[in-house]
């Protein structure tokens, strides 16, 4: 259980293991349920299109406890695959991204921040973690550079 009291749905863990072990998904986006009591899957996709993933985050919404809908935070895992510049082959790194746009509501941002560790603890095998607060933070090239530690071709 997280500091916010939210629990992680078993579906979240099952889907993550399908991404990690079976390569069933390229990415998974997680969200808090509307009542903020459980972390659930927002979208699990086989799409290798970075823009599809990026748009899922950018277009995410959240409802405040008063019912107002605005931009929303999300958690995501993305299975990065890249070639090493040295020619030594292909590498995969599962990356956890905490998306909390600057213009999201204060309340959703606080609840997401206090629930993040519970999800991360449930997902064994994350290689890299990133915090993203605006669209520049989720540009493919900049994330790939971080994930690969500058070793990608």
Curated annotation (Swiss-Prot):
Belongs to the actin-binding proteins ADF family. One of its GO terms (molecular function) is actin binding. Keywords: Actin-binding, Cell cycle, Cell division, Cytoplasm, Cytoskeleton, Nucleus. Controls reversibly actin polymerization and depolymerization in a pH-sensitive manner. It has the ability to bind G- and F-actin in a 1:1 ratio of cofilin to actin. Binding to F-actin is regulated by tropomyosin. It is the major component of intranuclear and cytoplasmic actin rods. Required for accumulation of actin at the cell division site via depolymerizing actin at the cell ends. In association with myosin II has a role in the assembly of the contractile ring via severing actin filaments. Involved in the maintenance of the contractile ring once formed. SUPFAM superfamilies: Actin depolymerizing proteins. It is found in: Cytoplasm; Cytoplasm, Cytoskeleton; Nucleus matrix. GO terms for biological process: actin filament depolymerization; cell division. This is Cofilin. It comes from Gibberella zeae (strain ATCC MYA-4620 / CBS 123657 / FGSC 9075 / NRRL 31084 / PH-1). Its main location: cytoplasm. One of its GO terms (cellular component) is cytoplasm.
């Amino acid at each position: 259980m997280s500091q916010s009291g939210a629990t992680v749905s078993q579906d979240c863990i099952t889907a993550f293991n399908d991404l990690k072990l079976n390569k069933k998904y390229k990415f998974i986006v997680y969200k808090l349920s509307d009542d903020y009591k459980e972390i659930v899957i927002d979208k699990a996709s086989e799409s290798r299109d970075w823009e599809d993933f990026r748009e899922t985050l950018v277009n995410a919404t959240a409802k405040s406890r008063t019912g107002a809908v605005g931009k929303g935070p999300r958690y995501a895992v993305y299975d990065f695959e890249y070639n090493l510049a040295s020619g030594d082959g292909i590498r995969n790194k599962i990356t956890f991204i905490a998306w909390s746009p600057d213009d999201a509501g204060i309340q959703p941002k606080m609840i997401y921040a206090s629930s993040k560790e519970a999800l991360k603890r449930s997902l064994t095998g994350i290689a890299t973690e990133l915090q993203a607060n605006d669209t520049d933070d989720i540009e493919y090239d900049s994330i790939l550079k971080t994930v690969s530690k500058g070793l990608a071709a």
